[in-house]
Amino acid sequence: MMDNNEPISAEHGQAGENLAMNYLLEQGLTFIERNVRFKFGEIDLVMKNGKEWIFVEVKYRSKSQYGGAINALSSGQIKRLRRAAEHYMQLNNIDAICRFDLIAVDAGQIQWLPNAF
């Protein structure tokens, strides 16, 4: 049996991000950038809704056991994502409203939590 805490393969992570991105595009958001990496954190998806910038964390689980993807986000990950988003906005001279969304993908089912944290 696979331990739910094992890192998922990059291929599965990319598949989850593809599902999330396509879902958000269907909801009317605009894609800006993907997999923005800094030494202290990564942003899975950068999207926009009008003038609002949206930083999206995608959590993927092939099975919804052990609490599923929605419960896989730690306080440390939230802190790193916030720091990465702040740095991203500074680097790109963005002075706008932003929010942090979570997309949880469990066995192909998508849950979108706007303003998740």
UniProtKB/Swiss-Prot annotation:
Pfam families in UniProt: UPF0102
InterPro entries: Restrct_endonuc-II-like, tRNA_endonuc-like_dom_sf, UPF0102_YraN-like
UniProt cross-references to CDD domains, sorted A to Z: PoNe_Nuclease
Highest rank taxon of the organism: Bacteria
Record-level Gene Ontology MF annotations: nucleic acid binding
Family matches, as Gene3D superfamilies: 3.40.1350.10
Disulfide bonds: none
HAMAP family: UPF0102
Family: Belongs to the UPF0102 family.
NCBIfam families recorded: PRK12497.1-3, YraN family protein
Protein name: UPF0102 protein Ssed_4252
Gene source species: Shewanella sediminis (strain HAW-EB3)
